[in-house]
Amino acid sequence: MSEGHDQARFAPRPRRQASNSHDRANLDAELELIRARIDTVTARGREDFHDGKETYDVACMVIIRLAALLERPEFEPHMEAVTQKERLAIRTTRNIAAHTGYRSMNDDLFWLAVTQRVPAILDRLRGR
């Protein structure tokens, strides 16, 4: 075989753009996982929600995963329902949970965010 023929034979195909429906399906699947985590937290109740408890860690994962979704460029077209103020609050809460530690977290505000505010955001995202 000639060198030119080998190059053409093994040339990579151009990447195809992922379909928007595939992105939407992936987003919906992740939103369902976040919702399931919220249900776990809510089912245990506020009295069992504090640093050191499993539900507190699950709630942190809710915020971490939601913040990650907001940072993914392929999901950006679907994120119009999330206000800039909400995005900032989610990022700030994620940073406290992931980097600063729970001691600086206000448990009452964190409970409210995970059990009321985030579900409202998820409802808006699912409606799009």
Predicted regions and their residues:
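Solvent-exposed interaction patches of small proteins and small membrane subunits
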Residues: 2-128
